[in-house]
UniProtKB/Swiss-Prot annotation:
Keywords recorded for this protein, A-Z: Cell membrane, Disulfide bond, Endosome, G-protein coupled receptor, Glycoprotein, Membrane, Phosphoprotein, Receptor, Transducer, Transmembrane, Transmembrane helix
GO molecular function: lysophosphatidic acid receptor activity
Protein name as catalogued: Lysophosphatidic acid receptor 1
Annotated organism of origin: Ovis aries (Sheep)
Annotated region described as Disordered, given as residue ranges: 369-393
């Protein structure tokens, strides 16, 4: 009897602790989490896995080389030393590191996933989250910059280099924080019942947050570009009533429309399916989301390869700089800024703004002349004051 009464507190104490304290599984293997979530963990390389890995590595190499070419082109060509191109270079840097992150993923996926620890698995996913967030944030920053320049009737913003650096620092700070959140606590290691099926160590709540965050960013970009298109269309219609160049105005509007469709279309095609799949993973347990996971991962990876094409290769001078770099030729623009460098615009910027900028000034002058008044345009300077003795006689 005495022995029984002595041993009972020893047995009841662990039961009380287990019922009230969350149980964490930091020392468990990756296979433990995959088995609980029902996600298949391969033991050997099959044909499909080899094809996916080969295609993924090829895309990664193209991503890194293409974005490296963009960064070098912006560095060597002094005519690209403007805020919009600095943001494009930062976008290329984000996509370059995305290629590295995907490259690391390709060599630590499939059967190699079994060798990962909890920390290395979180690192693998955190690198992807960081670079993806930086890339999406750069796309948003470029959309905001284009919105400002169009509405101010400028080819380049007058934002100082210091402010550009601040924007870039904010982008990467936010990206690093977003990528590190699961590693510092927002995971399911201590909440095993709420683990995701697609990412077995990630919490369902984090994946919902991350998907909604990116979808909201997408909506903001849609609104910005729609506002730009509506504004340019309105100005173009106004100019067509006062100028003799309606075809040029129509071409300007259509060029902007094509650019918006390409930008938004690439984002929708590459990102929306994967983001919706993350939401279905949480909200639709009966949906077989794992069957489409690798396909949508490659699709999202292609976005980093398409960004240099959309934002850079459509620029004629950027294309010329590419050819000069690849052919090891020296350009006149690499030696220093030219006198008219501030007025030289990329074909992308010029297509959107040049016709609006020049023709709208002529329309404004015609209107003010009809009213008999004189107004200064935004880019014009007031006439110098007359000196004594130089007035009219």
């Amino acid at each position: 009897m005495a022995a029984a009464s002595t041993s009972s507190p020893v047995v009841s104490q662990p039961q009380f602790t287990a019922m009230n304290e969350p149980q964490c599984f930091y020392n468990e293997s990756i296979a433990f989490f995959y088995n609980r979530s029902g996600k298949y963990l391969a033991t050997e390389w099959n044909t499909v896995s080899k094809l996916v890995m080969g295609l993924g590595i090829t895309v990664c190499i193209f991503i890194m080389l293409a974005n490296l070419l963009v960064m070098v082109a912006i560095y060597v060509n002094r005519r690209f030393h403007f805020p919009i191109y600095y943001l494009m270079a930062n976008l290329a840097a984000a996509d370059f590191f995305a290629g590295l992150a995907y490259f690391y993923l390709m060599f630590n996926t499939g059967p190699n996933t079994r060798r990962l620890t909890v920390s290395t698995w979180l690192l693998r996913q955190g690198l992807i989250d960081t670079t993806v967030t930086a890339s999406v944030a750069n796309l948003l920053a470029i959309a905001i910059e284009r919105h400002i320049t169009v509405f101010r009737m400028q080819l380049h913003t007058r934002m100082s280099n210091r402010r550009v650096v601040v924007v870039i620092v904010v982008i990467w700070t936010m990206a690093i924080v977003m990528g590190a959140i699961p590693s510092v606590g927002w995971n399911c290691i201590c909440d095993i019942e709420n683990c995701s099926n697609m990412a077995p160590l990630y919490s369902d709540s984090y994946l919902v947050f991350w998907a909604i965050f990116n979808l909201v960013t997408f909506v903001v970009m849609v609104v910005l570009y729609a506002h730009i298109f509506g504004y340019v269309r309105q100005r173009t219609m106004r100019m067509s009533r006062h100028s003799s160049g309606p075809r040029r105005n129509r071409d300007t509007m259509m060029s902007l429309l094509k650019t918006v469709v390409i930008v938004l279309g690439a984002f929708i095609i590459c990102w929306t399916p994967g983001l919706v799949l993350l939401l279905l993973d949480v909200c639709c347990p009966q949906c077989d989301v794992l069957a489409y996971e690798k396909f949508f991962l490659l699709l999202a990876e292609f976005n980093s390869a398409m960004n240099p094409i959309i934002y850079s290769y459509r620029d004629k001078e950027m294309s010329a700089t590419f050819r000069q770099i690849l052919c090891c030729q020296r350009s006149e623009n690499t030696s220093g800024p030219t006198e008219g460098s501030d007025r030289s615009a990329s074909s992308l910027n010029h297509t959107i703004l040049a016709g609006v900028h020049s023709n709208d000034h002529s329309v404004f002058r015609k209107e003010t002349k009809m009213r008999g008044g004189h107004h200064l345009l935004r880019d014009e300077q007031p006439p110098p004051p007359e000196r004594p003795g130089q007035g009219r006689v």
